[in-house]
Amino acid sequence: MAVSKIRIKLKAYDHEVIDKTARSIVETAERTGAFVFGPVPLPTKRSRYTVIRGPFKDKDSREHFQLNTHKRLIDIQQPTPRTVDSLQRLDLPAGVNIEIKAT
């Protein structure tokens, strides 16, 4: 059975790295003749953490930290075998988590 669609989900803490990665994936897929939809920016997940500053008492003094997880979605319609091969050979940065589903 031939693959009719590839869905790629990207997650990263740095929005510049994820945008650069999405751009390279889209350029590679378009260069090989596939139809590309995206990158679609998905909602950013914000995790907030509150920590007591001092090691002893002073519970009134606290610090707040926030961790943003940026997400992008790319759909590749009618990928050719050349598209799949070029996506496998693509060199991607280490700070990006990639999920690939082929249907």
Curated annotation (Swiss-Prot):
Record keywords, A-Z: Ribonucleoprotein, Ribosomal protein
N-terminal signal peptide: none
Gene Ontology cellular-component annotations: ribonucleoprotein complex; ribosome
One Pfam family here: Ribosomal_S10
Matches recorded under SMART domains: Ribosomal_S10
InterPro entries: Ribosomal_uS10, Ribosomal_uS10_CS, Ribosomal_uS10_dom, Ribosomal_uS10_dom_sf
A biological-process GO annotation: translation
Gene Ontology terms, MF aspect: structural constituent of ribosome; tRNA binding
Keyword Mitochondrion carried by entry: no
Family: Belongs to the universal ribosomal protein uS10 family.
Quaternary context: Part of the 30S ribosomal subunit.
Purpose of the protein: Involved in the binding of tRNA to the ribosomes.
Classification via NCBIfam families: PRK00596.1, rpsJ_bact
The protein's name: Small ribosomal subunit protein uS10
Source organism of the structure: Rubrobacter xylanophilus (strain DSM 9941 / JCM 11954 / NBRC 16129 / PRD-1)
Taxonomic path: Bacteria, Bacillati, Actinomycetota, Rubrobacteria, Rubrobacterales
